[in-house]
Amino acid sequence: MGQSSSTQAESKSESFLAKPSGACCLKGTIHEGESRGTWETIADVETYITRPPEGKENGNILLYFPDVWGMFPNGLLVMDAFADAGYLVLGLDYFRGDPVWKHRKDRHDNRNPDFDYEAWKRKHTAFADKAVPKWVDSVKKSYGTSTSKFACVGYCFGAPYVCNELKGDTVTVGAFAHPAFLKEHHFQDLKKPLFLSCSEIDHTFDVPSRRRALDILQTNKKTFHYQVFSGVEHGFALRGDQNDPYQRWVKEQSLAGIVSWFDYWLSQ
């Protein structure tokens, strides 16, 4: 979706509701499991593609926008889980093989003192802002059919791309979990249903920001569902400790809620 120069200037001057990815985005654990998808270059961006098991296809397509950890094992396994629910899933590596964990393994990792996190974010945001619309168009042309519908999901860094798609015509429904980089216009401009999966503890999308986002959604009569889990932090839907029964349950419930949301709206 393109923006006029005046609209771009206004959006740049807005303050963030969900702040840019910060130190909380560097925390997490790597999950065990073998991903089953394949890789393909689409619109000059490496893309992970995972398909539903035979006989479980629902005919619909899910676009996946990753968090700052990029195409790491947890993300691939989550995409496979969406495929298990019947979706053809495609996720693009807009970090181009340069996820944040290559530079910092966690928020206390200072082994690379020259790493400039702010410059890293600026570099990859600039690329993703241009690459995502082209990539979505290419996916639609290559994989869309006369009967297929599109959904999209984004984690952290990927949240604004979900909102951008939900103001256009390609995607029918969307969802994000523990978002970053969101401003008021992302909520004001929505034309399609949005699922918000959030954590009680989140310095990126804190309580006042969540309340403001909900106020915008309600005032503008948007279609949405708000889910919040107590006792977990930013990153819960992708990077929680799977040896902790509650964190595992939260991750699974977030995904199940998103799938149910997609299934409903894509059946209408």
Predicted regions and their residues:
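N-terminal cap/leader regions of alpha/beta-hydrolase-fold enzymes
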Residues: 2-268
